[in-house]
């Protein structure tokens, strides 16, 4: 008999709506013993079967659901089915948009909670973010090797969130050949170098692909400021859109060096690209005090909030940085501003920008809305999957 997690009375509603998480407060008791990450059955207070998931005894998310089908076992065949289902959408998208790199598995939204897999050419980069994902590592890798024999598999499970569930950070080649130090990929007509070994996330921010493309419509003959530029994807796109100048700002010299290489790789005019290593908050104030002006500003900061206790501070940070950006824009200028914080709702982010405009003494029109690219789907029963939001704003 399998180990069972029994829900408290009345706490089954979210599972009946196929939400993939069970929080600790919903648990009445455990029947049997399960190790960290082991697969368990989840039942209501009367013993009615609801789902099968991965158990994490110390996490606020006590179980993450693998399946709502009682006949489905969690094994190599299960992972193969999920991978093949996800691949169908990515195949269509890659052909339609001319991509060689994309998110293959987007965690819960692809029915594989705690698992992220990005494909860069013939390299699969894996992040296992939960105890259940780690417990199923061998089965998942076997399924990947069978379905993608042409691909090497590289582990980037070196993210701090693993520590919350008592797991060590892991990093390195799992199968196949070692990726080059910098791997060229293609995105909307751009060639970009990505660092699988040490780059942010799995190597690159694939979720901003469509936002980078959208930037081009705003930048012709414009002066652009690219804040938190990382390896210059927005900068390359701005140059391809015909900007007169783009200034890229980041605290990482290594990222800026790759950004410069990306401009050169695309045979764009390097004299129109400036790379500044500095703190964005500090530099924006310096630019304001010097009277610098820009026509377009891209504001793509890292996540400001990890948990609810940090939300108020994050709101202040987002407001301050957007206020400074609005102050630096010429009349009619465009602010492309983003938040990748899952706890920051689109409505709250829009209000923060409105408050920033008031503090800056400017009027702002919202003219376009952004979200993560289509290879990062959001399943309808898991709204938390929509983490990236952004706006194009016209500053009066």
UniProtKB/Swiss-Prot annotation:
Keywords: Cytoplasm, Methyltransferase, RNA-binding, rRNA processing, S-adenosyl-L-methionine, Transferase. InterPro entries: PUA (IPR002478), PUA-like_sf (IPR015947), PUA_sf (IPR036974), RLMI (IPR023542), RlmI-like_PUA (IPR041532), SAM-dep_methyl-trfase (IPR019614), SAM-dependent_MTases_sf (IPR029063). Disulfide bonds: none annotated. SMART domains: PUA. It holds the Pfam family PUA_3. PROSITE patterns: PUA. One of its GO terms (cellular component) is cytoplasm. GO terms for molecular function: RNA binding; rRNA (cytosine) methyltransferase activity. The keyword Electron transport does not apply. It catalyses: cytidine(1962) in 23S rRNA + S-adenosyl-L-methionine = 5-methylcytidine(1962) in 23S rRNA + S-adenosyl-L-homocysteine + H(+). The keyword Transferase applies. Its EC number is 2.1.1.191. It is found in: Cytoplasm. Residues 2-81 form the PUA domain. It comes from the Bacteria. Specifically methylates the cytosine at position 1962 (m5C1962) of 23S rRNA. Belongs to the methyltransferase superfamily. RlmI family. HAMAP family: 23SrRNA_methyltr_I. This is Ribosomal RNA large subunit methyltransferase I. It comes from Shigella flexneri. The gene is rlmI.
């Amino acid at each position: 008999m399998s180990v069972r997690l029994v829900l408290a009375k009345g706490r089954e509603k979210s599972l009946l709506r196929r939400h993939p998480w069970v929080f600790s407060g919903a648990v009445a008791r455990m029947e049997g013993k399960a190790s960290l990450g082991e697969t368990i059955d989840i039942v209501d207070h009367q013993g009615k079967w609801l789902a099968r998931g991965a158990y994490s005894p110390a996490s606020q998310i006590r179980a993450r659901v693998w399946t709502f089908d009682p006949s489905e076992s969690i094994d190599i065949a299960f992972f193969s089915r999920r991978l093949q289902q996800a691949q169908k959408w990515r195949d269509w998208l890659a052909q339609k948009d001319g991509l060689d790199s994309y998110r293959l598995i987007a965690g819960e939204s692809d029915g594989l909670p705690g698992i992220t897999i990005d494909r860069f050419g013939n390299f699969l980069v894996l992040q296992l973010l939960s105890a259940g994902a780690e417990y199923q590592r061998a089965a998942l890798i076997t399924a990947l090797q069978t379905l993608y024999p042409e691909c090497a598999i590289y582990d980037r499970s070196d993210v701090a969130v693993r520590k919350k569930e008592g797991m060590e950070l892991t990093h390195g080649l799992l199968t196949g050949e070692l990726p080059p130090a910098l791997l060229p990929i293609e995105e909307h007509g751009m060639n970009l170098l990505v660092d699988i070994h040490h780059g942010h996330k799995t190597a690159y921010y694939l979720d901003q692909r469509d936002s980078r493309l959208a930037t081009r419509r705003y930048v012709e003959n414009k002066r652009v400021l690219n804040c938190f530029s990382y390896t210059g994807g927005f900068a390359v796109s701005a140059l391809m859109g015909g900007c007169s100048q783009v200034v890229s700002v980041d605290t990482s010299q290594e990222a800026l060096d790759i950004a410069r290489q990306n401009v050169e790789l695309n045979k764009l005019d390097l004299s129109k690209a400036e790379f500044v290593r500095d703190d964005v908050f500090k530099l924006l104030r310096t630019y304001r005090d010097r009277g610098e002006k820009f026509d377009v500003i891209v504001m793509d900061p890292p996540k400001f909030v990890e948990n609810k206790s940090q939300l108020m501070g994050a709101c202040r940070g987002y407001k301050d940085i957007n206020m400074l950006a609005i102050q630096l824009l010429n009349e009619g200028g465009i602010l492309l501003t983003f938040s990748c914080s899952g706890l920051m709702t689109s409505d709250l982010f829009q209000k923060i920008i409105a408050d920033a405009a008031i503090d800056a003494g400017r009027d702002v029109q919202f003219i376009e809305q952004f979200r993560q690219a289509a290879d990062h789907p959001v399943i309808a029963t898991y709204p938390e999957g929509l983490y990236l939001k952004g706006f194009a704003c016209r500053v009066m």
